[in-house]
Regions:
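C-terminal and inter-domain tail/linker signature
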Residues: 1-139
Length: 139
């Protein structure tokens, strides 16, 4: 069931921080393309990317807002997910020194799934909006 798979991946990896689930859900040589020109290959690099986001926002909670897919078990599936997340900028990481500001972000992720594994991921979210929320005027 595609819906259950997608919800389980997001909940287990992003919300429960169970990074060992990456190896279960993703092909070992998964190809990733993301915001700000990020491109990498492999589950180790994917794990590093996820941990880098969570290092900046350790209380990040992600939810799926919309989910669409097409395909079949034989040929694989193409999945599109619109998600939202809320977290507090409490940790050092890609977004500088902690500001303790709450940040809302949303993004779109597309997956190509073959043989019950994610083989390609495209994820886009507005990193400028994150920086504006972190560095914006203090009221």
């Amino acid at each position: 069931n595609v819906r259950e798979f997608v919800h389980a991946v997001y909940d287990t990896i992003w919300n429960r921080r169970n990074f060992s689930a990456i190896n279960k859900a993703y092909s070992s040589n998964v190809e990733f393309e993301g915001s700000t020109g990020r491109k990498f290959k492999g589950t180790l690099q994917l794990r590093k990317f996820i941990i880098s986001i969570l290092a900046s926002f350790p209380d990040l909670a992600l939810s799926i807002e919309d989910l669409y897919w097409m395909g079949n078990t034989k040929d694989g599936f193409l999945v599109s997910v619109r998600w939202g997340a809320v977290g507090t900028h409490k940790g050092n990481g890609s977004y500088g020194q902690p500001t303790n500001r709450e940040v809302y972000l949303w993004g779109i992720t597309q997956w190509q799934i073959k043989d019950n594994k994610i083989v390609k991921e495209w994820t886009g979210f507005n990193e400028l909006a994150i920086l504006m929320q972190i560095l914006g005027d203090k009221k």
